[in-house]
Structures are given as C-alpha cells and as structure tokens.
Amino acid sequence: VERDIPSICSQLVLRSGERIRIYCLHPTPPSPTESDTSAPRDAELLLVGKQIRERDETALVFGDLNDVAWSHSTRLFKKVSELLDARIGRGMFNTFHAHYRFLRWPLDHIFQSPEFQIKQMAKLSDIGSDHFPIYAKFQYCPAEEHKHEVETADTGEMSQADEKIAEGREEAN
C-alpha cells in the first residue's frame, strides 16, 4: 500500500515441486510519529490475505504487524486469508518492547496454511532490537488428515476487508 514500506513476497519450491509462498511484512504502525490511523497497516495485511485466498496458496506470513492477535484487523486477516495463527495454544509471545519488562505486547506474528504443523516455537533472548526474535520450526504435511480447521470470512467480512483496503490505499496516497 505504501511505496516506501518494504514487504517481501518470495516463493519456496520444495523437492517435490510444490510451491510455498512466503510473505514478510512490516506495515506502518498507527502512532503520532508514523500514521494517524491504522488504515494503511490494515490495508497491507488484508491485501496479502485476499491474495493468498484468491490464489489458493500454501503460505507462511511473518512479520512485525504492529497489531495484537486479538484486534479486529488481525482476526479479519485470519478469516480472509484462511491461515492459522501459530501462537494459538502455544502462548502469547510478547515480543515488543524488549527493553521494558512490564510493558510488552505480542506484535510479531507467524501465520501458516493448515498444511503446516508447528513442531517448535519459542521467543528467543534479547538481540539488541526493540523486539525479541521468534523461532519456529514447521513440518509440511499436505495430507488431508493433518490439516487444521480454519476460520473463513463470510460475505460481510469480505466486503469489510475490501472497504478497509480502499480506505488504506486512499490514505497512503
């Protein structure tokens, strides 16, 4: 959405020939020094979510999304993309702010397609950043019996995502 904010979209080709799309995102946070609203951030996330859904991609999404897992925007992204939050059932992983012990939020996220099983996940020690790093080990299990159930956006939620994308694009320009 914002031209000066880097995002990475890459493709991993497995030995079997199967392709996995990898997205690394770091949208602008809503703050007085960055952006007046969350519209550009929400639009960036929802654009990626729609792309994953429309292309029916097997995907991993990583990043400092500058949002918490329980926000409306993040929950809408999960439904639109039909991805799973790697954190569910494993803990909060409060990764920001690494320098303030009593004021930390889970702003760094990992979302995966249901074909992935999380074998290991951990918040690592301070590396000098204002965020703690997260380590995750995945196992690709495309067999149907390994898939987890995902939440799916209904028509109203898809319309809401389209509205948020339009609003974010308008604000970014």
Residue ranges and their predicted role:
Residues 1-172:
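Soluble catalytic domains of enzymes that build or remodel membrane lipids, polysaccharides, and related
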